[in-house]
Design a protein with these regions (language model features):
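Primarily the dimerization/phosphotransfer
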Residues: 830-881, 897, 911
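Hydrophobic anchor positions in the alpha-helical DHp
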Residues: 667, 909-912
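Residue-level "micro-hotspots" composed of small/polar
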Residues: 23-49, 79-89, 129, 175, ...
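Short alpha-helical segment of the dimerization/phosphotransfer core of two-component systems
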Residues: 894-902
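Residue-level detector of Asp-centered blade-edge/turn motifs that repeat once per structural unit
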Residues: 49-52, 95-98, 138-141, 184-187, ...
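Conserved beta-propeller blade signature
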Residues: 55-56, 100-102, 143-145, 189-192, ...
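Short loop/turn segments that connect beta-strands within beta-propeller blades
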Residues: 68-71, 113-117, 157-161, 202-206, ...
Length: 912
């Protein structure tokens, strides 16, 4: 017996109608835009947002992406690199209570390391390390619960990465068990969605069994295959099934559980989310996006190739609603879309190809509204469309079989006006004037060929005075009026008008002021006409007044639009020369420029709200004048406008205060009271640090970074690393392209560098020292984050300029000086010794010379007496005739021998 029969629950079968309405709910007009062009076209299996505000997108085949509102960063499996994902097939992404990011893949589990921007692969066991992880949860002990397809359920202690097997009591064939989702209820119950039904985890026993729910009759279990689970703060549990729609489990006032089955689809509900209003968003396989509000009303969004703002595919694998109510949807093969309510402040009415219930064509030239609340919309090349916002229907008056009015035969409509009697006036570019009187079904056409008064078929502008007379401005034939009482048309071409060429002016815009004066804006300036019907009307040309003003910038007085505000000032919009305000009494002219944050060159239309706010449209979007700050607040396509270029005098203020502006792509409309300032400024994160244009990778050899730069408080750089670039971004997903930045290097600069939308800062040749790099951002509404992001930077002095090096240099210098001193001293001593030795040697040589001379002299002195001795002795000894006594002869011989010996010694001495 089925669950819904057991508990008398209500089965709701819905036939989806594409134009089903939720009153004024934002769900009526969900407009989805891709987050980026380069996001994966693989199945988007998971989308989450971490505590820092970074989005993480899991894909089946392209790994995981991080997204910060500006750019995507892709993490994939890389063969041989264990710091990457173990598989690019990502099935689920989970953020635990400590902001740790876990990624379940076809090959197991991964933990993201923020400090190093890399992954750790978690191994379950040695025998079965390849597990197809499909769901991740967390229990009260901060342990992870991991559900797989075909490998069972595991519990992981994140403190030591110890893995335990969870016993599954509900099913004994683990190889066929498929865990699809894990969610925790507000009461702490942990539920598992699986192919065998809804299971509940028992943390005390570490086991899994069927979840039992107490009802009025008996405990019941759900054995339908469950694809997704949503637990809400109100205690209700929502289950997305495989083919039986949506199941709601709620607690009754008697604390019994009640079941309700919503058969909203027979396709797989792959993802469930809820918004702040309690609406349930269901992402389905091949059945689009289905939303169930808290009243039980269902709206279905399906792919429509003619709807550029609709969903891109009927196969939606993931839905995520962030803390700022943005809706993110991930497709099977179309990437990721986002709906941002903040971008929908400006709504639009557009021409959609092949859709009859849209504008006939794009370029809207005029907008007005009748008493029935219907909008009459003038269209270039499209005639007039009548739009009924209550019925959301368009009636194209060019179609002669329409039920509102026939006879409009011109497609080139310039202006549409509804007077106080509810007569409708249509001015065309080439077919004159069309008048549809109240209660009539056929337009009356007034043009040159059937009127003796009308001289131009180009009708540019209408206005009504307090007497009910209609004033008409034409192209090149000036001013006309139409008296509704008499039904007569009048052309103003008297001498006074001719003298100022009013009768041949190209009137672009005319208004009637509070005194019934007529103001006309032409291609040759501004004119005020008082008492226009008198014989001598007073016509004041303001061209000379404007041209003679000290601030005048008009070249040719090319006016495009004028209005009178509640203070009776005349606001003047020009083609190419900007905006000015005229005080008709003092004739004071006030021009607006960049000093008031005014950045339009051409003003196409101006309008004032009931609260007195001035809004204008031009060639650069829409602007509001803030009278308190005396400056303009500007809005463009980044804020949700369909274009920045608007048509002349195509605007309207409805009775309920809604502003409408016509442009070349349709109509933008909005409630000015809803255009509030975003009070949250962007937080700035650092994304890269480059030295000499090369990105620095943490923990690489020689890298000054130990962590990624955004996780680094201070970085220390060498003296040769003083040319660096810091990349940054301001976190934001609403109009992120409008975020602007300012930075400065404290200690090197004294003031902020305001760099508009540039997201990097480069410094070169920074001297050694301690610095703080500071960067802040401002959101699109001008709110600055006054708490800048700071990175400390220390640039080291060259090693040869350090104190230790200087001390070493000093000691080395002193040592060298000492060595040189010692060396010189030794050399000096040696030189002195040599000198002394030389002097001693010279003295010795001189002494020797004197001695030799002395010896020589003595030798000569000795030789002569000796010779005188030897000669007699030789004669005595040689005289044989004289016989001497033997003793005397012997003594003579001794004397002779010694004398001879002495003579030889003297000869030797002489020879020396």
């Amino acid at each position: 017996m089925s669950v819904h029969k057991l508990y008398n629950t209500i089965t709701i079968t819905i036939i989806f109608i594409s134009n089903m309405i939720f009153g004024q709910s934002y769900i009526d007009n969900l407009k989805f835009k891709p987050i980026a062009e380069n996001v994966s076209q693989r199945a988007i299996t998971s989308i989450i947002k971490d505590q820092k505000g970074i989005m993480w997108i899991g894909t089946q085949g392209d790994g995981i992406y991080s997204f910060n509102g500006h750019e995507l960063k892709n993490y994939i499996h890389k063969w041989g690199d264990k710091k990457t994902l173990n598989s690019s097939g990502v099935n689920t992404v989970f953020l635990d209570s400590n902001n740790n990011l876990w990624v379940g893949t076809d090959e197991g589990l991964n933990l993201y390391q923020r400090d190093l921007d890399q992954f750790i692969r978690i191994k379950f066991d040695d025998l079965n390390s390849r597990n197809q992880v499909r769901a991740i949860g967390e229990n009260e002990q901060k342990k992870l619960l991991i559900g797989t397809h075909g490998s069972g359920v595991f519990e992981l202690d994140t403190s030591n990465q110890k893995v335990e097997v969870v016993k599954v009591l509900a099913y004994d064939n683990i190889s066929k068990l498929q865990i699809n989702d894990i969610k925790t209820t507000p009461r702490g119950a942990i539920l598992f969605g699986s192919n065998i039904g809804l299971l509940k985890y028992n943390s005390l026993k570490n086991e899994l069994n069927y979840a039992e729910f107490t009802t009025l009759s008996q405990p019941e279990i759900i054995k339908k295959p469950i694809e997704s689970i949503l637990t809400k703060l109100d205690g209700n549990i929502w289950l997305g099934t495989t083919n039986e729609g949506l199941i709601k489990i709620s607690t009754s006032p008697t604390n019994y559980f009640e079941f309700k089955n919503y058969t909203i689809t027979n396709k797989r509900i792959l993802s469930l989310e809820t918004d702040r209003n309690g609406a349930i968003f269901c992402g389905t396989e091949n059945d689009g996006l289905i939303i169930l509000d808290n009243q039980g009303t269902v709206k279905s969004f399906r792919f429509n190739k003619s709807d550029t703002n609709g969903i891109k595919s009927n196969s939606i694998w993931s839905v995520f609603i962030d803390d700022e109510s943005r809706v993110w949807i991930g497709y099977f093969n179309q990437g990721v879309d986002i709906y941002d309510n903040e971008n929908e402040r400006f709504k639009s009415i557009e021409s959609i190809p092949n859709k009859d219930q849209s504008l006939f064509s794009k370029s809207v030239t005029s907008i007005t509204q009748d008493k029935k609340g219907r909008f009459w919309i003038g269209i270039s090349d499209g005639g007039v469309d009548v739009y009924d916002p209550k019925k959301e229907t368009f009636t194209h008056l060019l179609n002669q079989d329409n039920t509102i009015a026939k006879g409009l035969k011109s497609s080139d409509v310039v202006s549409v006006f509804i007077d106080s009697n509810q007569n409708t006036w249509v001015g065309t570019w080439n077919s004159g004037l069309f008048l549809l009187k109240k209660g009539y079904k056929v337009f009356e056409n007034i043009q040159i060929k059937n009127s003796n008064i009308l001289k131009s078929n180009r009708i540019m502008s209408f206005a009504e005075d307090s007497n009910g007379r209609i004033w008409i401005g034409s192209f090149l034939t000036g001013l006309y009026s139409y008296d509704q009482k008499s039904g007569t048309l009048k052309h103003y071409q008297s001498e006074t008008y001719e003298s100022l060429y009013i009768n041949s002016k190209n009137i672009r815009k005319l208004i009637v002021d509070h005194q019934n004066n007529i103001w006309i804006g032409t291609r040759t300036g501004l004119y005020k006409i008082e008492n226009p019907d008198s014989k001598t009307p007073k016509i004041t040309p303001y061209s000379s007044i404007i041209n003679n003003s000290s601030e005048s910038r008009i070249r040719g007085n090319l006016l495009s639009t004028i209005i009178e505000d509640k203070q009776n000032n005349i606001w003047i919009g020009t083609d190419g020369d900007g905006l000015c305000k005229l005080n008709p009494i003092t004739e004071e002219i006030k021009w607006f420029d960049l000093s008031e944050n005014f950045d339009h060159q051409s003003i196409k239309s101006i309008i004032q709200t009931k609260d007195g706010e001035i809004w204008l449209a031009g060639n650069n979007g829409i602007s509001k004048f803030d009278s308190v700050k005396n400056e303009f607040i500007n809005y463009n396509t980044q804020d949700g406008l369909i274009t920045n270029n608007f048509n002349k005098n195509s605007n309207y203020l409805s009775d309920n205060g809604i502003l409408y502006f016509g442009c070349y792509k349709g109509i933008n409309y909005f409630d000015p009271k809803a255009i509030t300032t975003n009070p949250t400024p962007p937080v700035v994160y650092l994304t890269d640090f480059k030295i000499s244009n090369l990105s620095i990778i943490p923990s690489e050899m020689g890298s000054p970074l130990k962590k990624v730069v955004n996780e680094t408080a201070k970085i220390k750089l060498g003296h040769d690393q003083n040319m660096f670039t810091i990349d940054y971004f301001g976190l934001g997903y609403t109009r992120s392209k409008n975020i602007e930045y300012a930075y400065y290097l404290e200690g090197f600069e004294t003031d902020w560098n305001y760099v508009k939308k540039i997201r990097n800062a480069t410094y070169t040749n920074i001297p050694a020292g301690d610095y703080n790099f500071k960067v802040k951002a401002v959101n699109s509404d001008g709110i600055w984050n006054e708490t800048p992001t700071v990175l400390g930077i220390k640039i080291l002095v060259p090693w040869w300029k350090t104190n230790v090096a200087l001390l070493i240099f000093l000691l080395l210098t002193l040592t060298i000086v000492y060595v040189i001193y010692k060396f010189l001293k030794v050399r000096l001593v040696e030189r002195q010794q040599i000198k002394n030795e030389r002097e001693e040697r010279a003295q010795d040589e001189a002494l020797n010379a004197k001695k030799i001379q002395f010896f020589t002299n003595i030798s000569h002195e000795f030789r002569t007496p000796l010779t005188l001795i030897l000669n007699p002795l030789e004669a005595i000894i040689g005289n044989k005739t004289v016989e001497l006594p033997s003793d005397i002869e012997e003594k003579h011989t001794i004397i002779y021998k010694n004398s001879k010996r002495l003579s030889r010694l003297i000869d030797e001495l002489m020879d020396f």
